Amino acid sequence: MRSLIGMTFLNSSVGQRRLRQNGIVLRLGPVVADRRRATLPHRQGHCLDRQDLETLLLWLQRHFLCVPLEHLLEGPAPTCLRIALSVDGNPAELAELVYPLLERYEMPASAFIGGDPRSWREAVAETLWQADATAAGPLLELLEGYSGAALMAVFERTGDDQRRSRNLDLLLRKLERLDPASQQALHAACPVPAPYSAGDWERVRRLENSGLLRFGLRGQEPPPSAGLCAEDCLGRAHRQLQQHCVAPLPVFCQARTTPAAQPGLRAALGRLGYRFAFGARNGLVDTRCDPLDLPRIEVDAAIAARPGRLAWRIYRGARP
């Protein structure tokens, strides 16, 4: 029913008029090579497999003009329905799994690099799933007080990935009841992703040179103190992006758990030339939006597999 309502709105004159006055930016989760990995219970559908991504791109082509992100943010185009894509993933995933489909269907996209993109839930899940006792040591010490004997059943590798993933999902749901400070402490105890290698930056340059992918700066998760982020972390990541990209986007993407850019961060973004920033809100971009707290629409595996559900999300975002 929701898909039917969404498609009716999308194809109606009222819906078309409303959407021409707005911009739609989709945030696509990381793309993995096979459906089995994407559908493990503890991933909660945040990953997309290649087949679902292709299904989504074909649907978008039928209903929208896919434009570069910076073109969409400059203002409305009353003659057509426009949409822009932002994709998550490291340079290898983008080059091997995402770019070939963007090239096939001639659809531009943006990606944000810099800070750790993982939420506390994703960081804890990934650390436990890897089952590396040395790397996970600090996290295991914190978790022992929350989960008891159930923890080792989750941490130990078994031949039954589905069962282990279900147990991990149950543990994560229990941890969701913790206060935000405790959740951020869990995140801080997880191993930090390795910095980009020379090979990663070479992939970034090749992707940018293709003309289909442009790169912007991503905020840190968990967010450091406002002063540190604005004056140290942000500036260092900005210089690295400027060094390795020919035309980096003047767009900043905040950590997903950060509500809106604080005054110190806003000032730093202005000094560094960032005119736009995405916050944590879901919705459509219009002229009334705060340019440093822009919304996007999250696309998970369920929506990518059945894009009619995206029409419902768009309908909800377009309602006054």
Residue ranges and their predicted role:
Residues A84-D88, L94-L97, E103, P108:
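Glycine-rich active-site/cofactor-binding loop and its immediate structural neighborhood
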Residues V31-V32, C80-L81, E103-P259, L294:
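Metal-dependent polysaccharide deacetylase catalytic core of the NodB/CE4 family, i.e.
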Residues M1-S86, E93-A95, S210, Q220-P320:
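C-terminal active-site subregion of NodB/CE4 polysaccharide deacetylases
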